[in-house]
């Protein structure tokens, strides 16, 4: 097993605020990450957009190949010029099904959109919330 490094390189400028602490924790707790984090220290997660789109993409991509998820996402997102929770709620189920979404995934996307439009998620507070509170909010959404 590789030894725990005494100090990790500084995170890249584009890294989220929590990145250095998360890397430090993972290096201590996971033997694979202990080797990978120093090796890829110039890398960091970056946001791919707003939380609604990120979660919607996650739902679309569940239990399918990356290629299939990408094709389905492309067809689904083409249904709208502006992919927002409110606009998703305006879509017809048949149109979403025609984009390649299963009935269950349509239900999940509608529930996700409802959580956003009804302000049941406190996205703006997530950075200050503890993990358990965020998990509770997210797992209240069907399909998450």
Regions found by a protein language model. Name each.
Residues 55-57, 96:
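Amphipathic alpha-helical segments that form the core helices of the histone-fold
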């Amino acid at each position: 097993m590789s030894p725990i490094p005494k100090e990790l390189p500084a995170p890249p400028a584009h890294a989220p605020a929590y990145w250095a602490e998360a890397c430090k924790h993972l290096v201590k707790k996971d033997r694979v990450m202990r080797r990978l984090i120093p090796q890829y220290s110039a890398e960091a997660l970056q946001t791919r957009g707003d939380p609604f789109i990120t979660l919607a993409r996650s739902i679309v991509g569940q239990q399918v190949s990356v290629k299939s998820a990408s094709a389905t996402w492309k067809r689904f997102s083409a249904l709208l010029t502006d992919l927002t929770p409110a606009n998703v709620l305006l879509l017809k189920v048949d149109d979403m099904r025609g984009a390649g979404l299963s009935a269950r995934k349509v239900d999940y996307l509608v529930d996700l959109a409802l959580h956003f439009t009804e302000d049941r998620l406190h996205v703006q507070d997530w950075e200050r919330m503890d993990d358990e509170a965020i998990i509770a909010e997210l797992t209240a959404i069907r399909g998450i």
